[in-house]
């Protein structure tokens, strides 16, 4: 028996890293989990490796209608939604004077607009059940967790676009918490620091991802990785499992 038996969770960007660790933890506690990733093969593999009940929605969540389709996949699979973790994201780093409009907009799209669209699409599936439960004298809580970053709370040189997107998600979180508290929806943001994922791995030719047919370089230079680790009280980055709360 898990504390999440019978619950349904959507975790975006959940085929790797923090998202996967979160999906695994939710599944271990009894939740059915919708896995999402740009890469359908990786998403299917992750779903097959998670012991609990899963479904998959593969695709670019910034595409028109994708967030609605993501939510509908969860409804078609299980008929309800209890938990949403807005985790999907990546980085395109550059100093401000060399950053293109496109690079700036893409970070806002994935880190702020996609969570907004997912939440908006899920609204009737979170609010309407709560209205009925309130009439019946029940108190059932649902959860939304938006993944931010210390880049959004403190800023980070070379990441004006990412920092802006991650700062905006904090404002969205606070606003939604005030709007949906009456429906017993707890809305929180988690601002991670240095977690060992492919976004913080060594910056080399092999560490790339494809977005919209374009290869995007991921990672940070080894010198900066070493400097960052020195600033962490533990003396090392966090792991995806620690970030997930396991």
Locate the predicted segments by residue.
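Canonical Rossmann dinucleotide-binding motif of NAD(H)/NADP(H)-dependent dehydrogenases/reductases
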Residues: 2-34
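Substrate-binding pocket helix/loop in short-chain dehydrogenase/reductase
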Residues: 95-96, 103-108, 228
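Active-site loop immediately N-terminal to the catalytic Tyr-X3-Lys motif
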Residues: 97, 154-160, 182-183, 235, ...
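Active-site helix of classical SDR
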Residues: 119, 165, 173
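Alpha-helical segment proximal to the catalytic Tyr-Lys
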Residues: 124, 178-182
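Residue(s) in the substrate-gating loop at a strand-loop-helix junction
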Residues: 149
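A glycine/serine/threonine-rich, flexible loop-to-helix segment
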Residues: 182, 194-231
């Amino acid at each position: 028996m898990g504390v999440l038996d019978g619950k349904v969770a959507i975790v975006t960007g959940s085929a790797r890293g923090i998202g996967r660790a979160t999906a695994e933890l939710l599944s271990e506690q009894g939740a059915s989990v919708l896995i999402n990733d740009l890469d359908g093969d990786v998403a299917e593999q992750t779903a097959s490796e998670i012991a609990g009940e899963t479904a998959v929605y593969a695709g670019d969540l910034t595409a028109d209608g994708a967030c609605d389709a993501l939510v509908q996949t969860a409804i078609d699979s299980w008929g309800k939604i209890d938990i949403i973790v807005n985790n999907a994201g990546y980085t395109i780093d550059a100093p401000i004077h060399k950053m293109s409009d496109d690079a700036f907009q893409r970070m806002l799209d994935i880190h702020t607009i996609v969570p907004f669209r997912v939440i908006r699409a899920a609204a009737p599936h979170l609010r309407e059940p709560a209205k009925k439960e309130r009439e019946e004298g029940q108190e059932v809580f649902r959860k939304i967790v938006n993944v931010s970053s210390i880049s959004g709370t403190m800023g980070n040189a070379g990441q004006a676009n990412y920092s802006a997107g991650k700062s905006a998600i904090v404002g969205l979180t606070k606003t939604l918490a005030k709007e949906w508290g009456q429906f017993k929806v707890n809305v929180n943001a988690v601002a991670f620091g240095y977690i060992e994922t492919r976004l913080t791995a060594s910056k080399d030719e092999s560490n790339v991802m494809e977005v919209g047919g374009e290869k995007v370089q991921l990672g940070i230079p080894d010198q900066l990785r070493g400097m960052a680790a020195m600033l962490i009280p533990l003396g090392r980055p966090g792991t995806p499992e620690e970030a997930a709360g396991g």
